[in-house]
C-alpha cells in the first residue's frame, strides 16, 4: 500500500485542478469556434464521451511526446530513439530522420536476448529460411510445425509441468484462456493490481469477480471465506469453481507475489491457483524458472501457470502450462488456439534457443552468467536509487523498479529531461495507474554494464533534483579515510 505524503497529495490534486480549470476555459472558447466552422460529422455520435474525451484532449495531448516513442534499432542496452516534432501543440507528432543513441531503461529485455545473440540469432535465421516468417494458418489447420511441438516440450521441461500450449500473443493468452477455464456460476478472486489482460479475461468469462487487497494473503482468505459462505448471487448455491488469480511480479509495482501463503490458502479452501509469470519467468530464480523456484513453491501446487515470451526470452507470444487434461481441453476449446494464426516459427525458435542458453544446454555457462548479472544489476540499481532519496517500489531481485512521481507535471519533466541526457525511460500515469500515483518504470537488463548503470544513476539523480521527486532524505555519502590521515587516540 502506497502512503502518499500529505503535501504531495495536496500539490498533486492542485495540479490536476489547475489543468482541469484551464482545460474547461479552453473548451468554453472552443464552442464559439465550433459554432462558426461547421463540421462534416454533424449527427454522428462522438467516439469519446465526457471526461474521457476531456482527458485525452486537454491533458494527454500535452505530454503525448513522452509516450510511444519509435526506435530504429534492436532493444539492447543502448538503442536509437527517433526524434519527433509537432506543429500543432502535440496533437500530431511527425518523425524526423534524426535519432538519439540512448541508454535503454524501458524495454523488458531482462536477459539481453532482445538483440543479436551468438547462439540464438543464427538458429532463428536458419528457421526463417526454412519455414518463412509466418505459418499463415491456425494451430489446428496447417499452423503446427515441428518447431512448435519442440517449443511446447521445451516449455514443459523448463517450467516443471506435465504439459503446455503456446500462443502467438501474450496479452491474448490471459484474455482468451480465462473465459475458457471458468464461466457463469464460477468465482474469480483477483488481486486488485492484476494486469489488464487478466481483468478483461475475467470480465469476458461471465463469472462473478471479487477483488482482494494487493498482495495481502490475509484479505484473500477473508474474501474466500465470505464468498464460500454466501455462495452464488441470489440463489446462494455453492460455486461451481473458484479460481484465484495472481502475478509472479506485478508489472507496475515491481513486487513479488506472496505465493507460498496464497497456495496454502487455496489448498485450505479448495480453490484453483492461476499464476501469471509474464515478468518473473526467466528473470528470477537460481536457474531462471520463476517465482516458484525463487520462493520454493512446488509447481504441482500451482494449477495453471501462465507466462509470456516477450520479456526474458526476446520473442513474442505466451504459454499455459498445467496438467495434460487441462492442456488437451484448452487445445480443443480456446479460440486463441483454434482460430488465431500460430506463433511465427522464427519466434518459436528464438524461445527454444533462449531456454537452452538459460539451462546451459548450449554448451556454455552464459545463461547462469545472465541470471547472476540481472540479479546483481537489479539489486544494485534499486539500492542506489533508494540511497539517493527516491521512493522506489518493489522487492529485491525484481528487475522492475517504479520511481514515484505523483504530480502530473513531473511526468513530462522527468521523461523529457532524461531523454535530453540520452537516457530513455518509461513514464506511466492515469489511467494505467491511479490518478495520484504517476511513476517512472525502470526495467533493468543483464545486458547493462556497471558503467551503464552508474551513468544512468547520475542522470536520474540530476533530473530528480531538477524535478523535485526525491521524497526522502538521501543517505550521507561515506568519505573514505585517506591513508595519510593522522589518527588521534
UniProtKB/Swiss-Prot annotation:
Keywords: Acyltransferase, Apoptosis, Endoplasmic reticulum, Lipid metabolism, Membrane, Pyridoxal phosphate, Sphingolipid metabolism, Transferase, Transmembrane, Transmembrane helix. One of its GO terms (molecular function) is serine C-palmitoyltransferase activity. Its cofactor is pyridoxal 5'-phosphate. The keyword DNA repair does not apply. GO terms for biological process: photomorphogenesis; pollen development; regulation of programmed cell death; sphingosine biosynthetic process. Disruption phenotype: No visible phenotype. Lcb2a and lcb2b double mutant is not viable due to pollen lethality. This is Long chain base biosynthesis protein 2a.
Amino acid at each position: 500500500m502506497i502512503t502518499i505524503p500529505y503535501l504531495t497529495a495536496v500539490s498533486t490534486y492542485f495540479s490536476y485542478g489547475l489543468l482541469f480549470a484551464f482545460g474547461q476555459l479552453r473548451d468554453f472558447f472552443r464552442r464559439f469556434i465550433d459554432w462558426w466552422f461547421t463540421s462534416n460529422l454533424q449527427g454522428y455520435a462522438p467516439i469519446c464521451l465526457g471526461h474521457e474525451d476531456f482527458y485525452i484532449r486537454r491533458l494527454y495531448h500535452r505530454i503525448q511526446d513522452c509516450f510511444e516513442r519509435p526506435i530504429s534499432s534492436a532493444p539492447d542496452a543502448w538503442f536509437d530513439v527517433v526524434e519527433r516534432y509537432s506543429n500543432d501543440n502535440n496533437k500530431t507528432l511527425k518523425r524526423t530522420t534524426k535519432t538519439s543513441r540512448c541508454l535503454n531503461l524501458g524495454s523488458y529485455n531482462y536477459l539481453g536476448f532482445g538483440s543479436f545473440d551468438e547462439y540464438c540469432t543464427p538458429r532463428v535465421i536458419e528457421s526463417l529460411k526454412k519455414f518463412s516468417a509466418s505459418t499463415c494458418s491456425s494451430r489446428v489447420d496447417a499452423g503446427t510445425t515441428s518447431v512448435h511441438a519442440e517449443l511446447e516440450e521445451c516449455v514443459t521441461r523448463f517450467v516443471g509441468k506435465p504439459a503446455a500450449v503456446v500462443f502467438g500473443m501474450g496479452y491474448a493468452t490471459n484474455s482468451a484462456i480465462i473465459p475458457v477455464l471458468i464461466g457463469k456460476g464460477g468465482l474469480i478472486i483477483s488481486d486488485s493490481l492484476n494486469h489488464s489482460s487478466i481483468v478483461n479475461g475475467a470480465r469476458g468469462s461471465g463469472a462473478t469477480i471479487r477483488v482482494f487487497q494487493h498482495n495481502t494473503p490475509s484479505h484473500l482468505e477473508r474474501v474466500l471465506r465470505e464468498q464460500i459462505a454466501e455462495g452464488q448471487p441470489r440463489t446462494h448455491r455453492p460455486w461451481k469453481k473458484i479460481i484465484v488469480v495472481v502475478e509472479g511480479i506485478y508489472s507496475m509495482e515491481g513486487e513479488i507475489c506472496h505465493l507460498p501463503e496464497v497456495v496454502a490458502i487455496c489448498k485450505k479452501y479448495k480453490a484453483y491457483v492461476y499464476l501469471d509469470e509474464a515478468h518473473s519467468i526467466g528473470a528470477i530464480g537460481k536457474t531462471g524458472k520463476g517465482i516458484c523456484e525463487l520462493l520454493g513453491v512446488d509447481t504441482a501446487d500451482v494449477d495453471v501457470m501462465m507466462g509470456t515470451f516477450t520479456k526474458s526470452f526476446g520473442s513474442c507470444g505466451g504459454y499455459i502450462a498445467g496438467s495434460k487434461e487441462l492442456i488437451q481441453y484448452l487445445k480443443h476449446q480456446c479460440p486463441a488456439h483454434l482460430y488465431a494464426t500460430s506463433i511465427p516459427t522464427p519466434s518459436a525458435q528464438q524461445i527454444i534457443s533462449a531456454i537452452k542458453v538459460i539451462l546451459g544446454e548450449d554448451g556454455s555457462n552464459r545463461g547462469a552468467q545472465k541470471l547472476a548479472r540481472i540479479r546483481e544489476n537489479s539489486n544494485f540499481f534499486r539500492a542506489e536509487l533508494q540511497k539517493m532519496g527516491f521512493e522506489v517500489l518493489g522487492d529485491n531481485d525484481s528487475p522492475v523498479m517504479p520511481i514515484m512521481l505523483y504530480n502530473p507535471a513531473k511526468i513530462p519533466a522527468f521523461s523529457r529531461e532524461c531523454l535530453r541526457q540520452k537516457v530513455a525511460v518509461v513514464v506511466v500515469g492515469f489511467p494505467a495507474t491511479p490518478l495520484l500515483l504517476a511513476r517512472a518504470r525502470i526495467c533493468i537488463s543483464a545486458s547493462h554494464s556497471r558503467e551503464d548503470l552508474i551513468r544512468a544513476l547520475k542522470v536520474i539523480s540530476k533530473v530528480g533534483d531538477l524535478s523535485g521527486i526525491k521524497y526522502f532524505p538521501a543517505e550521507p555519502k561515506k568519505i573514505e579515510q585517506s591513508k595519510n590521515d593522522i589518527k588521534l587516540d
